[in-house]
Amino acid sequence: EWRERNRHFEFLPRRHSKLCIAVATNPARPGDATVGSDDPQAVNTLRRVFDTVKWLPGGRGMYDKLVELALGGEAATTRTGPSYQVLAHVRVVRFREMEYTVPAEAGPACVREILRTVREKNLPVCFPLEYRYVKADDIWLSMFEGRDGCSISVHQYGDVDYRPYFAEIEPIFWK
């Protein structure tokens, strides 16, 4: 449904929860106004909570429950303006990122396998996974030229060795 109603959308799933953070991006309509604000420190808060509970038995599952409680009632934020302002986000955290674009029809299975791998192998990661769906365009150098696609990004904090995590996840994109 989100795919049909939006120019593109993204979601950030939680690894041990059925909740996610969802973002839809569409051209503005007359009367649209900015409502709410982003929190550029949110990813730092996620890490502090993770570092506090990760050593406890069941701590990673506890982490997602705490995040669910904290974010479950978040009000929607609406941003309007030129695309260079609306699509850009303040980054106050250093991180490493690996991103692949897959055909839209392969996106859901790919993200499910990534989440399953993180859970089953108990990978120590709390940085949000990003899944972004974009409709086809006609721009020759675009990853979405001629077809709908999904960009899936995995991240790790800049001061944490990203290689073990990325090495586990990257083969999933090659299928």
What are the language-model segments listed below?
Residues 1-175:
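Noncatalytic alpha-helical scaffold of FAD-dependent oxidoreductases
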